[in-house]
A protein has these predicted regions:
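Beta-strand-rich modules
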Residues: 422-443
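Pro/Thr/Ser/Gly-rich low-complexity, intrinsically disordered linker/stalk tracts
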Residues: 335-388, 441-475
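Aromatic-lined carbohydrate-recognition surfaces of secreted/lumenal glycan-active proteins
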Residues: 108-120, 174-175, 193-239, 285-288, ...
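Catalytic domains of carbohydrate-active enzymes, especially glycoside hydrolases
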Residues: 42-69, 167-171
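Solvent-exposed loop/turn segments flanking beta-strands in beta-repeat/beta-sandwich domains
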Residues: 382-407
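Active-site-adjacent "subsite" loops/lids of carbohydrate-active enzymes
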Residues: 16-18, 22-24, 28-42, 95, ...
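Substrate-binding cleft of secreted/luminal carbohydrate-active enzymes
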Residues: 246-247, 251-269, 286-355
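Aromatic-lined carbohydrate-binding/catalytic grooves of carbohydrate-active enzymes
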Residues: 54-90
Length: 480
């Protein structure tokens, strides 16, 4: 079975699929690479443009680094990656900028929260935190860690996540290192250890969902949940080694999504990927792939190690996540070029069907105005039957009726908030359909426009080339 999956042909592109990347800020290893505010902003925009053009629809940006942050707060100090001086403001809000720029490109932005590790014992973040809470931080070597066995740890992290949720229009809260550190000598039973970690997750879930229940709560567990009947985890797994019951969190509704760190290949990858799929309980799973392992300074993996994993994950209905951004955008061994072709057809984020939320009403008064070069489509807003704060709109185009909204090749604009769009038609007769989508990803029934007349025939349109998030590319070529 596994061999058949690996050798199978490229799976059909699904309409719903998570295509994610971890954007790492610690030490500026992915971003930023300069302490100049102007340069930082330009670099972030360039990175997000590259990700968008490769079909990425989810950005996990490292927001809490090591008891330090990339947003203004009195809770913890600024991380030093922004200015070179921990505790010093860069003069703007990087998290807000990333959210705005992701949304402008039709991508989700999740705040990546490093939970238990708080950095060097005498580092700015750890030092300030242990001055406030001297009994909460444990020293192991020269590193500090929040104590997962103390209830105050869950309270603190829940309050921190609530602050991010309250202040920012993030699409997700993504928990990292939500487990016992591998260097921690666990003295309680594994069952009790799992309960301690689950208690923290429960507190964070309640804090986030009470404010904005549409926000996806996720984590990045160890890549192997536990030993399988035929395949062993070699002593390094989530459930037993570090008391991280990630599959149980999906089952019990504490998590909406998992991004397992599956930095493996062969039989260390495929059986465990299937295990995550079989225990996803209808939630989102998008395994992390080790694109960094292709670098000659790492393990020098061949490109086809990653591309086969991508194909198999798509075939079994899982998304994928790249670790980490710079190795991806640097096109290590051609991974960026491959992914851009692999994701040529756009994808929406899977809807949160487990919430039971009702889809919005259809849009009203859909109109089309045609000029010699473009169609302008406009509509009136739909009615949101959920508790979300605003609606998003998806636009589909086809040269035939009815417009098939189940075919992702027809998607030309995703997750846009505006109530109109201009589409270059290249002289062809196009039909359009518009759907409303709530913050849970539930999509309304489509409303279609009739064709707006016919002009002289031109070569067939490639709708995928038109997409640029919730905007459309102009057909005039741009030289780089």
């Amino acid at each position: 079975m596994l061999l058949a999956l690996v050798l199978s042909a490229k799976a059909q592109t699904p309409k719903h699929e998570v295509r994610a990347v971890w954007l790492t800020t610690i030490g500026g290893i992915d971003w930023p690479h300069s302490y100049s505010t102007t340069t930082q902003k330009a670099e972030l925009i360039s990175i997000l443009d590259q990700l968008q053009q490769a079909g990425i629809n989810t950005v996990l940006i490292q927001t809490r680094v090591r008891a330090t942050t990339i947003f203004p707060t009195t809770t913890e100090p600024w991380d030093g990656c922004l200015t070179g001086h921990p505790g010093t403001s860069p003069g703007y809000d990087p998290l807000q900028m990333c959210i705005d720029e992701c949304h402008r490109r039709g991508m989700e932005c999740h705040a990546w929260i490093v939970t238990i590790p708080v950095g060097k014992w005498n580092g700015t973040g750890c030092k300030q935190l242990r001055q406030k809470y001297p009994t909460l931080i444990k020293k192991i070597g020269d590193e500090g860690y929040m104590n997962p066995e103390m209830p105050q740890t869950g309270d603190y992290l829940a309050n921190f996540c609530a602050e991010v949720t309250r202040k920012y229009d993030v699409d997700g809260i993504h928990l990292d290192y939500i487990r016992y550190p591998e260097t921690w000598k666990i003295k309680v039973t594994r069952q009790q250890g799992r309960q301690y970690i689950t208690d923290i997750v429960t507190k964070i879930n309640r804090a986030v969902k009470s404010l904005k229940p549409w926000i996806k709560l996720s984590c990045s567990p160890i890549g192997k949940y536990d030993d399988l009947s035929r395949y062993r985890s070699s002593g390094w797994n989530a459930n037993t080694t570090v008391c991280q019951d990630a599959q149980g969190w999906l089952r019990d509704g504490l998590m909406d999504a998992l991004f397992p760190m599956m930095y493996f290949q062969g039989n260390n990858f495929y059986p465990f990927a299937i295990d995550w799929h079989e225990h996803s309980y209808g939630r989102i799973v998008a395994p992390g792939l080790a694109v960094y392992m292709m670098h000659p300074r790492e393990k020098n993996w061949d490109l086809d190690v990653i591309t086969r994993e991508m194909s198999v994950l798509r075939q079994i209905g899982l998304g994928c996540t790249f670790f980490r951004s710079k190795f991806f955008t640097d096109n290590t061994k051609g991974i960026y070029d491959f992914t851009r072709d692999f994701n040529i057809v756009p994808a929406l984020i899977p809807p949160m069907t487990w919430t039971g939320k009702q889809a919005p009403s259809a849009v009203a008064q859909l109109k089309i105005k045609r000029s010699m070069t473009a169609d302008n489509i406009s509509w009136q807003k739909a009615v949101d039957y959920s508790d979300g704060d605003y609606l998003l709109y998806n636009v589909y185009a086809s040269e035939s009726l009815p417009v098939d909204i189940n075919n992702p090749e027809n998607l030309i604009a995703v997750r846009q908030r505006e109530l109109s769009i201009t589409v270059p038609h290249k002289g062809r007769t196009l039909h359009y359909a518009v759907t409303a989508m709530n913050r849970y990803g539930m999509e309304s029934k489509p409303v279609e426009t009739p064709a707006a007349g016919t002009l002289a025939s031109s070569k067939p349109l490639n709708f995928q080339q038109m997409i640029i998030g919730n905007k459309l590319k102009k057909y005039k070529s741009k030289k780089k």
